[in-house]
Regions:
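Conserved acyl-donor/pantetheine-binding loop and adjacent beta-alpha core of acyl/acetyltransferases
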Residues: 5-7, 20, 24, 34, ...
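Conserved beta-strand-loop-alpha-helix junction that forms the acyl-donor binding cleft
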Residues: 73-83, 94, 98-104
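Conserved GNAT acetyl-CoA-binding A-motif
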Residues: 63-75, 85
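Acetyl-CoA-dependent GNAT
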Residues: 1-45, 56-57, 125-126
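Glycine-rich acyl-CoA binding loop
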Residues: 37, 48-59, 63, 67
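Active-site acidic-Proline motif in GNAT/NAT acetyltransferases
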Residues: 43-49, 77-78
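Conserved active-site tyrosine of GNAT-family acetyltransferases
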Residues: 86, 91
Length: 126
């Protein structure tokens, strides 16, 4: 349901290899002069090949060209790989939305064997 809302409200972009979509993200206008990258994903078979970083650079360039001054992204507290990627791409940790996933998702989420309960919010100035 949340993903459908993102798609309806945002701009959707895909990453392609040999004509096949292997990654995607949605760019949302969330507040004045602020956009957020949501629902970013890369197929597991092609992860760690620079596709996620390329999509994040594309998101930053697209947001900047559209007049946004800030770009935000969020990930779960157990998403250490995602946080490292986002940091390498210029995002900085801003705040933690404690209990976000526990509140908004009926089933517990585990990532790398750890409970994903909090949303780590990150941002970059464009």
């Amino acid at each position: 349901e949340a993903v459908a809302d993102y798609v309806d409200r945002g701009w959707c972009y895909g990453a392609f290899l040999a004509g096949r979509m292997v990654g995607e993200y949605v760019l949302l206008h969330t507040r004045p002069f602020t956009a957020e990258v949501v629902n970013i994903a890369v197929e597991p078979a092609v992860q760690r090949q620079g596709i996620g970083g390329a999509m994040l650079r594309h998101a930053a360039e697209t947001a900047r060209a559209s007049g946004f001054r800030k770009l935000e992204i969020g990930t779960g507290n157990s998403g250490f790989g995602q946080m490292a990627l986002y940091t390498r791409c210029g995002f900085r940790m801003e705040w933690i939305d404690r209990g976000f996933f526990s509140l908004h998702y009926p089933e517990p989420i585990l990532e790398a064997g750890l409970p994903c309960t909090d949303m780590v919010r990150m941002g970059m100035l464009l």
